[in-house]
């Protein structure tokens, strides 16, 4: 069963932890790709200098952050990669969760082809570990791009999260990645991951 709007309507830090173990579903050419969410980061615009919406900053790019909980915010980085976030709390609050890593579950050959243009059996050990172990890596592997920006995960048939009961794990809380510019916010323990999962991007 897919997650509903009510599930997403909570503090980003709470949602980031509760999304761990849930399953991201992405339909590509009629084939459903599935991956367990194993790493997330929370961003809270009002108080978070690492957020694109810090201090109420509002631009055309960041407008999805102010949308309804359950909306996708997909942004472009380094001129070639995408990152996928899910909006949380309430409309206008600019809170969201970055999906940092997935554990591939279903249709892994297509996931592999999208990521490396190879069958999964052709991948070396390094490639297998890195297939979805990072925010831009999972976007490549699950064909998530700017077309998915603003997509409503509560209504979409091609991008949503399933409420699957993978809950037998310990959650690690630590600092977020790549935000050294964010002053005191770089020390917030707002990154969450499943302990000992092989697909976590940074431990």
From Swiss-Prot:
Record SUPFAM superfamilies: FMT C-terminal domain-like
GO annotation terms (biological process): base-excision repair
Gene Ontology MF terms in the entry: alkylbase DNA N-glycosylase activity; DNA binding
InterPro entries: Formyl_transferase-like_C_sf, MPG, MPG_sf
Alphabetical keyword list: DNA damage, DNA repair, Hydrolase
EC number(s) stated in the UniProt entry for this protein: 3.2.2.-
Pfam annotation, one family: Pur_DNA_glyco
tRNA-binding recorded as keyword: no
Highest taxon above the source species: Bacteria
Family, per entry: Belongs to the DNA glycosylase MPG family.
NCBIfam families in UniProt: 3mg (TIGR00567), PRK00802.1-1 (NF002001)
Entry protein name: Putative 3-methyladenine DNA glycosylase
């Amino acid at each position: 069963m897919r997650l509903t709007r009510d599930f997403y309507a909570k503090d980003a830090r709470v949602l980031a932890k509760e999304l761990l173990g849930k399953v991201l579903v992405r339909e590509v050419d009629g084939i459903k790709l599935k991956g367990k969410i194993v790493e997330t980061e929370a961003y809270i615009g009002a108080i978070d200098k690492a957020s694109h919406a810090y201090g109420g900053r509002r631009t055309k790019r960041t407008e999805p952050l102010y949308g309804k909980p359950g909306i996708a915010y997909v942004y472009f980085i380094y001129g070639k990669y995408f990152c996928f976030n899910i909006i949380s709390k309430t409309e206008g609050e600019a809170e969201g969760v970055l999906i940092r890593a997935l554990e591939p579950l279903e249709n892994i050959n297509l996931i592999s082809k999208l990521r490396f243009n190879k069958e999964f059996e052709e991948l070396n050990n390094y490639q297998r570990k890195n297939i979805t172990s990072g925010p831009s890596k999972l976007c490549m592997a699950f064909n998530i791009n700017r077309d998915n920006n603003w997509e409503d995960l509560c209504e979409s048939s091609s991008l949503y999260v399933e409420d699957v009961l993978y809950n037998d794990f310990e959650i690690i809380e630590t600092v977020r990645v790549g935000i050294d510019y964010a002053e005191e916010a770089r020390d917030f323990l707002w990154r969450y991951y499943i302990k000992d999962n092989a697909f976590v991007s940074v431990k």
